[in-house]
């Protein structure tokens, strides 16, 4: 028994965890396979951020259990950290359950089933990401304690990862031809607060000093902690794409305080103005929660007005999900699902209009694009203003001789609500 596969659910941080597990197991001589039916060991990296994520994880486990036969089914990640005993009781087909950050325990477990096999350590690099980009996790955990979020209980307090290891990982990927590195953590603005004399600005400067042609993208910046130094660094460094993902969650101060969030609408507007003045070409992305307990219709409409005023380039919306163990779980004034759905749909419809207008404004302009996938007669690419998996894409039709992971110059020819079309020039 030496073949394994990994099914990854949830956020980019889980993607990184899966990649590290794959690397560790291949170095131990196990073989990564993409097809479930060829695997002796099936790993499922789970998520429990909201109810939909929990349901998706459980559905994936049940599907794997149904076709298990003589395979070993191993579940790890956030859901199993939080509900490990319940999973083992309710789904007896599961052979082992691990939490987060237990890679060494997983390796010890899997090795016991192959004691008599002759293993050869592999130098092949398998990945759960395309050949164009890699997520780079720069910190683990979170100490924010937002009232709607279970992450601190699952992943622990915020810990910055070793900068030398981060730089080494990126440098190795640059040498292998990767063209984009997406820095992720629950809140990257906190990076370095627990290190002596090493800050996020220093990390960005050190990353940009690595020789090579690549992009650096920043995801998940806490709005109140984006300072002038960080804005200046992003503006000055050519390798950092002018794209900021700033989850604001709401515009109204009363709701923000119930959420355990800092900041006010006035402060947010001031910060956005400051960023756009310093970086005129910046793409701003944010996420918001609708239907948080006690959110009134007036507060929701003021949120809609705020979104209209700011004109975010990219926007994500979540319907509030009641999570056990969070402070918001016991709040009175829970919003009915039909109201959440209506509010969600209204914001998404408004944002679709904004997005269409912004995408049509790109028509006739030339950009550098990074190709993620080649599929039949089309290629899927992204501009600096597109983060993978969460934003739209560029659809290219003249794809002869193109390769995934390649950068090309393109002309935008059509714009839609979320995607654009282009041709290579």
From Swiss-Prot:
<dbReference type="InterPro" id="IPR038135">
    <property type="entry name" value="Methylthiotransferase_N_sf"/>
</dbReference>
<dbReference type="GO" id="GO:0006400">
    <property type="term" value="P:tRNA modification"/>
</dbReference>
<keyword id="KW-0004">4Fe-4S</keyword>
<dbReference type="GO" id="GO:0035599">
    <property type="term" value="F:aspartic acid methylthiotransferase activity"/>
</dbReference>
<keyword id="KW-0479">Metal-binding</keyword>
<dbReference type="InterPro" id="IPR012340">
    <property type="entry name" value="NA-bd_OB-fold"/>
</dbReference>
<dbReference type="GO" id="GO:0005829">
    <property type="term" value="C:cytosol"/>
</dbReference>
<dbReference type="GO" id="GO:0103039">
    <property type="term" value="F:protein methylthiotransferase activity"/>
</dbReference>
<dbReference type="GO" id="GO:0046872">
    <property type="term" value="F:metal ion binding"/>
</dbReference>
<dbReference type="Pfam" id="PF18693">
    <property type="entry name" value="TRAM_2"/>
</dbReference>
<dbReference type="InterPro" id="IPR002792">
    <property type="entry name" value="TRAM_dom"/>
</dbReference>
<dbReference type="GO" id="GO:0051539">
    <property type="term" value="F:4 iron, 4 sulfur cluster binding"/>
</dbReference>
<dbReference type="InterPro" id="IPR007197">
    <property type="entry name" value="rSAM"/>
</dbReference>
<keyword id="KW-0963">Cytoplasm</keyword>
<feature type="binding site">
    <location>
        <position position="11"/>
    </location>
    <ligand>
        <name>[4Fe-4S] cluster 1</name>
    </ligand>
</feature>
<keyword id="KW-0949">S-adenosyl-L-methionine</keyword>
<dbReference type="InterPro" id="IPR006638">
    <property type="entry name" value="Elp3/MiaA/NifB-like_rSAM"/>
</dbReference>
<dbReference type="InterPro" id="IPR013848">
    <property type="entry name" value="Methylthiotransferase_N"/>
</dbReference>
<comment type="function">
    <text>Catalyzes the methylthiolation of an aspartic acid residue of ribosomal protein uS12.</text>
</comment>
<feature type="binding site">
    <location>
        <position position="78"/>
    </location>
    <ligand>
        <name>[4Fe-4S] cluster 1</name>
    </ligand>
</feature>
<dbReference type="Pfam" id="PF04055">
    <property type="entry name" value="Radical_SAM"/>
</dbReference>
<protein>
    <recommendedName>
        <fullName>Ribosomal protein uS12 methylthiotransferase RimO</fullName>
        <ecNumber>2.8.4.4</ecNumber>
    </recommendedName>
</protein>
<keyword id="KW-0411">Iron-sulfur</keyword>
<dbReference type="InterPro" id="IPR020612">
    <property type="entry name" value="Methylthiotransferase_CS"/>
</dbReference>
<keyword id="KW-0408">Iron</keyword>
<feature type="binding site">
    <location>
        <position position="149"/>
    </location>
    <ligand>
        <name>[4Fe-4S] cluster 2</name>
    </ligand>
</feature>
<dbReference type="InterPro" id="IPR023404">
    <property type="entry name" value="rSAM_horseshoe"/>
</dbReference>
<keyword id="KW-0808">Transferase</keyword>
<dbReference type="InterPro" id="IPR005840">
    <property type="entry name" value="Ribosomal_uS12_MeSTrfase_RimO"/>
</dbReference>
<feature type="binding site">
    <location>
        <position position="142"/>
    </location>
    <ligand>
        <name>[4Fe-4S] cluster 2</name>
    </ligand>
</feature>
<feature type="domain" description="TRAM">
    <location>
        <begin position="360"/>
        <end position="425"/>
    </location>
</feature>
<feature type="domain" description="MTTase N-terminal">
    <location>
        <begin position="2"/>
        <end position="115"/>
    </location>
</feature>
<feature type="binding site">
    <location>
        <position position="47"/>
    </location>
    <ligand>
        <name>[4Fe-4S] cluster 1</name>
    </ligand>
</feature>
<feature type="binding site">
    <location>
        <position position="146"/>
    </location>
    <ligand>
        <name>[4Fe-4S] cluster 2</name>
    </ligand>
</feature>
<dbReference type="Pfam" id="PF00919">
    <property type="entry name" value="UPF0004"/>
</dbReference>
<comment type="similarity">
    <text>Belongs to the methylthiotransferase family. RimO subfamily.</text>
</comment>
<feature type="domain" description="Radical SAM core">
    <location>
        <begin position="128"/>
        <end position="357"/>
    </location>
</feature>
<dbReference type="InterPro" id="IPR005839">
    <property type="entry name" value="Methylthiotransferase"/>
</dbReference>
């Amino acid at each position: 028994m030496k073949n394994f596969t990994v099914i990854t659910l949830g956020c980019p941080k889980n993607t990184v965890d899966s990649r590290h597990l794959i690397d560790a197991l291949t170095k131990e001589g196990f073989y990564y396979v993409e097809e479930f039916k060829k695997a002796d060991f099936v790993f499922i990296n789970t998520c429990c951020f909201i109810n939909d994520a929990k349901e998706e994880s459980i559905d994936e486990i049940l599907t794997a259990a149904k076709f298990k036969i003589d395979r070993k089914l191993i579940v790890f990640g956030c859901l199993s950290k939080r509900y490990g005993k319940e999973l083992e009781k309710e789904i007896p087909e599961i052979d082992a359950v691990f939490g987060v950050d237990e890679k060494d325990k997983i390796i010890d477990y899997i090795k016991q089933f192959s004691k008599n096999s002759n293993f050869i350590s592999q130098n092949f690099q398998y990945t759960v990401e395309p050949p164009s980009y890699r997520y780079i996790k720069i910190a683990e955990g979170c100490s924010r304690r937002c009232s709607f979020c279970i992450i601190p209980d699952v992943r622990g307090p915020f810990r910055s990862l070793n900068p030398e290891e981060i730089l080494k990982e990126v440098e190795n990927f640059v040498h292998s031809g990767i063209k984009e590195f997406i820095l992720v953590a629950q809140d990257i603005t906190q990076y370095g607060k627990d290190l002596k004399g090493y800050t996020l600005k220093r990390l960005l400067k050190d990353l940009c000093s690595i020789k090579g042609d690549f992009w650096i993208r920043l995801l998940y910046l806490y709005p109140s902690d984006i300072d002038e130094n960080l804005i200046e660094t992003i503006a000055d460094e050519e390798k950092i794409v002018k794209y900021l993902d700033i989850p604001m969650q709401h515009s109204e101060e009363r709701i923000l305080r119930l959420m355990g969030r800092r900041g006010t609408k006035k402060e947010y507007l001031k910060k956005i103005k400051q960023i756009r003045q310093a970086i005129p070409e910046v793409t701003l992305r944010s996420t918001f929660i609708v239907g948080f307990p006690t959110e009134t219709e007036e507060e929701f409409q003021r949120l809609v007005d705020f979104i209209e005023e700011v004109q975010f380039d990219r926007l994500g919306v979540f319907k509030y999900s009641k999570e056990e163990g969070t402070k918001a779980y016991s709040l009175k004034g829970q919003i009915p699902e039909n109201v959440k759905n209506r509010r969600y749909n209204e914001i998404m419809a408004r944002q679709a209009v904004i997005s269409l207008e912004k995408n049509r404004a790109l028509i006739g302009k030339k950009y550098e694009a990074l190709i993620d996938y080649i599929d039949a007669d089309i290629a899927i690419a992204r501009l600096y203003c597109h983060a993978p998996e969460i934003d739209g894409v560029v659809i290219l039709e003249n794809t002869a001789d193109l390769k995934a992971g390649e950068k090309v110059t393109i002309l935008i020819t059509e714009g839609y609500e979320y995607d654009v079309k282009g041709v290579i020039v």
